[in-house]
From Swiss-Prot:
Molecular-function GO terms, alphabetical: GTP binding; GTPase activity; metal ion binding
Protein name: tRNA modification GTPase MnmE
Gene encoding the protein: mnmE
Binding site for K(+): N225, T244, I246, T249
SUPFAM superfamilies: P-loop containing nucleoside triphosphate hydrolases
HAMAP family associated with the record: GTPase_MnmE
Cofactor: K(+)
Binding residues for GTP: 225-230, 244-250, 269-272, 357-359
E.C. numbers: 3.6.-.-
Subcellular location: Cytoplasm
Family, per entry: Belongs to the TRAFAC class TrmE-Era-EngA-EngB-Septin-like GTPase superfamily. TrmE GTPase family.
Residues involved in (6S)-5-formyl-5,6,7,8-tetrahydrofolate binding: R22, E79, K119, K452
Enzyme class: hydrolase
Length: 452
């Protein structure tokens, strides 16, 4: 790859005011000479003629020359900014490809070269794609934080503490267990406490960053005809779900994306939970339970016109079914307008009960404010964007850390501790790309836009 020069259109295909081409690689100087007639002044915008193979003008525009290593990719880079005609862009690309050893760039290849040439770490490279695909202001700001290296800083800080820990204990590795003095044992115990706190804080922040990227799954569940579909419609300001008086109308999962307090949330309407002989409806109910167990938050809708004892039984039965699940539950007491009770929120044993009318909209703003209150900790300028692979690697590192801590308590074996710390460093290093397989890189960068 390093011996090939690549070209791609940076701007979106189609007609536009401006079209930009980017070229990177060792042949870029030759491209500049053949297309521009010269190598432009480095890092200056130069008004240039773009020439074809007969030195006739194809277009006029701005050329930008970035000689290696001070460029996006760390290689020689040339950008041509011309008129955004698809025909002009195509003619320029064909002209550039006619030069030897030049090919079209693969998706994300410019960013991949930047990573491989040490211009950015893997987190920063991934955050470029996350910034482009951001759907809320908060996720865009978090992506920018990652691009600027804030996430990487915390990973490297933790890695440096691990390395420092290893250096301290490996200096004692040639001594017997009897010779390990009390002072060293105290140092190790202090280091364990320090690292434990660092891991927990970082894991909490990374989880917030993951929610910004992946979105939060909010499942709307309940018995048939409780008003689940009406709640989906009013929360999403749409008529996404069909609403009827017939029980079992909703049989499959209905998805609707909304933004709450800058966090992307996926609302999921589910089939009414009940015993039924209908085979198709039973499948829908099974899917509903599966989604409930996978969700971050359940809005469990209850028909408030039912008796108090019936409402309590419904709540108790549902909580028993998800007893071992960490999913957060809010009980939404719907049809409050029919009994003319007060609208509002009550908390019982830490669980919220909110009275609303999905038909009239009364009380729904209280529900929205409740959801916003739950998400408020995510709305923090210090949050950075995070991916599932980051969480996985951090979990692996933390699990190994807990294993190391337990093993040390039991055996006080310096060699085993040093080996565990080495494994932890490897897991953390994979997050920023210090130890990364080619398959992983291909998987990450193949999802990028062409031209990035």
């Amino acid at each position: 790859m390093r011996n090939e020069t690549i070209v791609a259109q940076v701007t979106c295909p189609g007609k536009s005011a401006v079209g930009i081409l980017r070229i990177s690689g060792f042949q870029t100087k030759i491209v500049a000479i053949k297309i521009l007639g010269k190598i432009p002044l480095a890092r200056f915008a130069t008004y240039s003629n773009f020439l074809d193979e007969n030195n006739e003008i194809l277009d006029k525009g701005i050329s930008l020359w970035f000689p290696a290593p001070h460029s996006l990719t760390g290689e020689d880079v040339l950008e041509l900014q011309g008129h955004g005609s698809p025909l002009i862009m195509d003619l320029l690309i064909r002209r550039i490809l006619s030069i030897n050893n030049i090919r079209m760039a693969k998706p994300g290849e410019f960013s991949e070269r930047a990573f491989l040439n040490g211009k950015m770490d893997l987190i920063q490279a991934e955050s470029i794609d996350d910034l482009i695909n951001s759907e809320t202001e908060l996720s865009a700001r978090a992506s920018l934080n990652s691009l600027q290296g804030k996430f990487s800083f915390f990973i490297k800080e933790l890695m440096n503490l691990i390395i420092e820990f290893r250096i301290n204990i490996e200096s004692n590795i040639d001594f017997s267990e009897e010779e390990i003095n009390i002072n060293m044992q105290d140092i190790i115990n202090i280091k364990f406490r320090e690292l434990h706190d660092k891991f927990l804080k970082l894991k909490a922040t990374v989880l917030k960053g993951s929610l910004l990227r992946e979105g939060k799954k909010i499942v709307i569940a309940g018995l048939p005809n409780s008003g689940k579909s009406s709640l989906l419609n009013i929360l999403s300001y749409s008529d996404r779900a069909i609403v009827t008086d017939i029980p079992g109308t909703t049989r499959d999962l209905l998805y609707e994306d909304i933004s709450i307090n800058g966090v992307r949330c996926e609302l999921i309407d589910t089939a009414g939970l009940r015993d039924t002989d209908d085979k198709v409806e039973r499948i829908g109910i099974m899917r509903a339970w599966e989604m409930i167990r996978k969700s971050d938050h359940v809005l469990f809708v209850i028909d408030k016109t039912l008796s108090k004892s019936k409402q309590k039984k419904i709540c108790d039965d549902f909580m028993k079914n998800i007893l071992n699940n960490k999913t957060q539950v809010t009980f939404v007491l719907n049809k409050n307008d029919l009994i003319k009770d007060e609208f509002g929120i009550k908390e019982i044993d830490g669980t919220a009960f909110i009275s609303i009318s999905a038909r009239t909209g009364e009380g729904v703003n209280i529900l929205r404010e409740h959801i916003i209150k739950i998400e408020k900790n995510i709305n923090n300028e210090s949050v950075f964007i995070a991916r599932r692979r980051h969480i996985k690697q951090l979990d692996l590192a933390y699990d190994e850390f807990l294993t190391a801590e337990n093993t040390w308590r039991e055996s006080e074996n310096i060699e085993l501790l040093a080996e565990s710390l080495s494994i932890i460093s490897k897991f953390l290093g994979e997050i920023i790309g210090q130890c990364t397989s080619e398959d992983l890189l291909n998987h990450i960068f193949s999802s990028f836009c062409i031209g990035k």
